[in-house]
Curated annotation (Swiss-Prot):
InterPro entries: SAICAR_synt/ADE2_N, SAICAR_synthase_Vibrio-typ, SAICAR_synthetase_CS. GO terms for molecular function: ATP binding; phosphoribosylaminoimidazolesuccinocarboxamide synthase activity. One of its GO terms (biological process) is 'de novo' IMP biosynthetic process. Gene3D superfamilies: ATP-grasp fold, B domain (3.30.470.20), Phosphorylase Kinase, domain 1 (3.30.200.20). It holds the Pfam family SAICAR_synt. This is Phosphoribosylaminoimidazole-succinocarboxamide synthase. Disulfide bonds: none annotated.
């Protein structure tokens, strides 16, 4: 098996029994199970959900996206070795820690394979729940140009790049394109304020206006749990994005849960603590890959300018990145995952074959 064979790049072609189209995201693909299979698994596996809950198989890939494009490497390498397993392992660890700290549940019911989650269907909140402890990235770029109000929050004068903020900030943005909301442009990833959410809470998917307080509490509490655990590993939790949704419990009550992934190198910035104390930034997240791309290509404006999207897509499609750059990303992801979980990240030689075997023999889901 070659290195390229060990990478799961295409994850939407598994022969999983489903009666609806596979939903393919940038990194994960979702297979909605039939009603019969959902009910059977809930009964035979003892999942703590109502028997009519729709279930899905969520399969992560090793693809890497940046600046809204998928990149690839030399030698037919269509992803980052170990990336998918690392992301899932980190999220699994944090979700377990959340439960131990009395926070909300997640959508995950079962983990058949390092690349696979069995999840319950949730009603998503249409908000990217972003939390920031340091001023860096897009916030710093805007601040350095004179902007002081972010998502309805006014920042003080005199802040410096990469410094710790006086308070933990919640700076939400829209999840997907939302139409008909006063003052909110119909564009993806638009910054919004708490006042925007309160005035239009149902349009953003909240069932009760009081749940806005709950989502902010779960966001801050989750951030603090991860931040403390990372600090014990001499890592700095800089900022992150969470997602939330509603599910119905066995008593028929609606409850807010964590969705997607949490505290990963894809959804967060994580800095090395020792380097930060020395005045340097050593990224243990995808931000390092973004910085590599900005330095690698002669015209970085293509990656930053949304008006040049066709050029950006061509750049990603037509340029194979150096193998060493791809392996550097692999080492970043597997390294931080092993720090967080305390265990080695499995790198199966043929992950697709392994997934099919498990889902056939242990779950009877392969056609």
């Amino acid at each position: 098996m070659s290195l390229a064979d060990s990478v799961l790049a295409v994850n939407n072609d598994l022969p999983i029994r489903t009666n609806s189209p596979v939903h393919s995201g940038k990194v994960r693909s979702v297979y909605w199970l039939t009603d019969a299979d959902s009910r059977r698994l809930i009964q035979t596996k003892g999942y703590n959900v109502p028997e009519d809950t729709p279930l899905a198989i969520m399969v992560i890939s090793d693809r890497i996206s940046a600046f809204d494009c998928i990149f690839h490497g030399e030698g037919g390498l269509k992803g980052i070795p170990g990336k998918g397993a690392a992301l899932n392992a980190i999220s699994n660890h944090w979700f377990k820690l959340f439960a131990e700290n009395g926070l909300a549940d997640s959508h995950i019911l079962d983990i058949p394979h390092p690349f696979v989650w069995i999840v319950q269907k949730a009603r998503p909140i249409k908000v990217e729940a972003i939390c920031r402890q340091y001023i860096t990235g897009s916030m710093w770029r805007a601040y350095s140009k004179g902007e002081r109000v972010f998502c309805g929050i006014t920042l003080p004068e005199g802040l410096e790049k990469d410094q710790k903020l006086p308070d933990l900030l919640i700076t939400p943005s829209t999840k997907g394109i939302l139409t008909g909301i006063p003052g909110v442009p119909a564009q993806d990833d638009v910054n919004i304020s708490r006042a925007d959410i309160e005035a239009n809470y149902q349009a953003f998917g909240f069932e009760k206006v009081e749940d806005i307080d709950l989502y902010e509490k779960l966001l801050k509490d989750g951030f603090k749990v991860i931040s403390k655990a990372l600090a014990d590993l001499d890592q700095v939790f800089v900022d992150t994005k969470f997602e939330f949704g509603y599910v119905t419990d066995k008593n028929g009550n609606s409850k807010l849960i964590y969705m997607d992934e949490v505290g990963t190198p894809d959804s967060s910035r994580i800095w090395d603590g020792a380097a930060y104390r020395d005045g340097k930034i050593l990224e243990n997240s995808k931000e390092g890959f973004r910085q590599f791309l900005l330095n690698h290509f002669p015209d970085p404006d293509i990656l930053l300018n949304k008006d040049r999207m066709p050029e950006r897509e061509a750049l990603a499609r037509d340029n194979a990145l150096p193998l060493e750059a791809m392996m550097n990303v692999s080492r970043t992801y597997t390294g931080i995952a092993e720090k967080v979980t305390g265990a080695a990240i499995p790198l199966p030689a043929n992950p697709k074959a392994d997934i099919i075997k498990i889902l056939r023999e242990e779950y009877d889901l392969i056609v």
